[in-house]
């Protein structure tokens, strides 16, 4: 499993085939490699997948990346991070229907890798809201996965989303994390469950880029050897 971030295959908001090819050669030098690859294309082009004016162009860009990878690494299974999109407060019929419009992309990907990061602690919102958030987002992915015969691998994280001003980047308590994972694994739509999860890990990156985050400062204050440090 590997992730390609937007800087590894996109230039100025457009697919950069030279850059994508370099990334493939760097991460998967053997052309017959078997692996899972998640493309993380966040930003305007991603947002435009749900716009009226730029939908076709964005869809074309997203699909062309998959076609290129399939041509050059035919044994790699590829999908997009955040497809279908995530919703916490407005997981309604409008959100569901908008995601169903991405049928051309669902037909192309090998799997769905919807993001189910945790935003709030149970002390900030009622635990049932966190449970419903997980259930509704996984159910939508499973519904789409069943329709297009695609496995679902929700992307999870052991930290709260950085948008949370009080708890952002703090480790999710172990028992809460177990509940989080179990809720994902137990969600079912017409007999279909997730095929697994993709566990995002970027502690080294955030340690370098979020040096002023109060929660990371507290966590790392007594760490002497980061190479041996393990999330507990």
What do the predicted segments below correspond to?
Residues 117-163:
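Glycoside hydrolase catalytic-domain groove-lining segments
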Residues 37, 41-48, 97-132, 199-203:
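Aromatic- and acid-rich polysaccharide-binding/catalytic face
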Residues 19-26, 91-103, 132-144, 179-183:
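Alpha-helical scaffolding within the catalytic cores
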Residues 84-113, 165-173:
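Substrate-binding cleft/loops of secretory-pathway carbohydrate-active enzymes
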Residues 1-86, 169-178:
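Substrate-binding cleft of extracellular glycoside hydrolase catalytic domains
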Residues 116-117, 151-232:
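Substrate-binding cleft of secreted/luminal carbohydrate-active enzymes
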Residues 1-7, 37-39, 78-80, 112-114, ...:
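Hydrophobic faces of well-ordered beta-strands that scaffold small-molecule active sites
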């Amino acid at each position: 499993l590997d992730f390609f971030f937007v800087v590894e295959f996109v230039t100025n908001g457009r697919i950069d085939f030279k850059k994508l090819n370099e990334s493939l050669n760097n991460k998967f030098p053997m052309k017959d490699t078997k692996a899972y690859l998640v493309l993380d294309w966040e930003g305007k082009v991603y947002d435009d997948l749900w716009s009226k004016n730029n939908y076709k162009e964005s869809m074309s860009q997203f699909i062309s990346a998959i076609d290129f990878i399939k041509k050059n690494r035919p044994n790699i299974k590829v999908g997009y991070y955040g497809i279908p999109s995530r919703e916490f407060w407005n997981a309604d019929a409008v959100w569901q229907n908008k995601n169903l419009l991405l049928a051309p992309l669902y037909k192309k990907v090998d799997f769905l890798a919807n993001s189910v990061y945790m935003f709030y602690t149970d002390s900030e919102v009622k635990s049932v809201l966190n449970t419903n958030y997980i259930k509704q987002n996984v159910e939508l992915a499973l519904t789409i996965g069943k329709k297009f015969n695609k496995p679902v691998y929700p992307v999870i994280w052991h930290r709260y989303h950085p948008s949370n001003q009080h708890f952002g980047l703090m480790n999710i308590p172990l028992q809460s994390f177990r509940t989080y994972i179990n809720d994902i694994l137990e969600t079912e739509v017409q007999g279909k469950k997730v095929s697994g999860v993709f566990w995002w890990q970027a502690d080294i990156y955030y340690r370098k880029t979020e040096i002023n985050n109060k929660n990371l400062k507290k966590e790392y204050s007594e760490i002497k050897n980061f190479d041996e440090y393990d999330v507990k």
